[in-house]
């Protein structure tokens, strides 16, 4: 993978709807081979950004380049290399999966052979149901068929906007495995917008977090998590007065939250023994201690701060 080869380059992107600024001077870079996580709370501007990337709406200002070319001037050439799913994919429900892809391939102008269609259906795990009408498909199968549609013209970049919305755990797992497969076996760059943070943590190598249309932070998922303070969860006996103990200690400046029998505190790893010692000395009955760094913790920390 050439990390210096930019597939997506967005600079100063802004979109205003009357008095609402949906995207505000947004900048990000996606490199060849990335599985890039595009994260933000509801209303952060993710879908608006994707719609501008796909020229479904025009930006108020700013610049988008795909494969090093200005999107506005090179739309036709660029989109030969791009596949996308935005919201729920539409199909002819009374036709088979195979027939749908055949028709959609012809509509897109792609030169698709029968063998190509079957290879794509096999790639997304639908080869055994290729002759079934789409109306008999589960939601998860329809999502995989949508990805198959995006693959028809052999793209180098796929844009997925919330591809796991409404799926059960098995469906989410199947989409996750498919994304990893497309990245590792086909070397396709993937731009993945999702609110399921655990999925981004598993599949993405790089990510950006946005809020109120602005870039908060961008970088390697691994490095961002490693630089994040540990979150410690301690289970204790409900009668313990943890709040008073912490407030009168060196840990009073740490961010912590207490429920009836649980303490969540942001803490450097080196300070864990001191915290445990303090609680034990104050006769707190501790039942368990769990240390974790998760994308969810980091996401909440960054978005709440901003």
Question: What label would you give each PLM region?
Answer:
Residues 62-73, 77-78:
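Conserved ABC transporter NBD signature motif
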Residues 102, 106-129:
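Conserved ABC ATPase "signature" region
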Residues 154:
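Conserved catalytic motifs of ABC-family nucleotide-binding domains
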Residues 158-162:
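Catalytic Walker B motif of ABC-type/P-loop ATPase nucleotide-binding domains
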Residues 176-266:
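ABC transporter nucleotide-binding domain
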């Amino acid at each position: 993978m050439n990390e210096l080869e930019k597939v997506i380059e967005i600079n100063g992107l802004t979109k205003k709807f009357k008095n609402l600024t949906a995207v505000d001077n947004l900048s990000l870079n996606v490199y060849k081979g990335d599985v890039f996580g595009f994260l933000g709370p509801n209303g952060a501007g993710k879908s608006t950004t994707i719609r501008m990337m796909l020229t479904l709406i025009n930006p108020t200002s700013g610049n988008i380049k795909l494969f090093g070319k200005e999107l506005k001037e090179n739309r036709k050439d660029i989109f030969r290399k791009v596949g996308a799913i935005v919201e729920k994919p539409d199909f002819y429900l009374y036709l088979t999966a195979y027939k749908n892809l055949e028709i959609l391939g012809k509509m897109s102008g792609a030169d698709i052979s029968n063998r190509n269609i079957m290879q794509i259906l096999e790639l997304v795990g639908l080869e055994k149901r290729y002759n079934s009408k789409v109306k008999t498909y589960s939601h998860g199968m329809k999502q995989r068929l949508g990805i198959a549609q995006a693959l028809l013209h052999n793209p180098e970049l796929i844009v997925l906007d919330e591809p796991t919305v409404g799926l059960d755990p098995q469906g989410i797992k199947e989409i996750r495995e498919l994304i990893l497969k497309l990245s590792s076996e086909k070397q396709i760059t993937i731009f993945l917008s999702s609110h399921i943070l655990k999925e981004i943590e598993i599949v993405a190598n790089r990510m950006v977090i946005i809020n109120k249309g602005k870039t908060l932070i961008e970088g390697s998922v691994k490095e961002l998590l490693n630089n994040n303070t540990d979150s410690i969860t301690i289970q204790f006996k409900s009668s313990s007065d943890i709040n008073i103990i912490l407030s009168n200690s060196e840990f009073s400046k740490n961010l912590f939250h207490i429920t009836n029998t649980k303490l969540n505190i942001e803490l450097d790893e080196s300070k864990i023994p001191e915290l445990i010692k303090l609680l034990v000395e104050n006769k707190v009955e501790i039942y368990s201690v769990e240390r974790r760094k998760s994308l969810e913790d980091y996401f909440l920390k960054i978005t709440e701060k901003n």
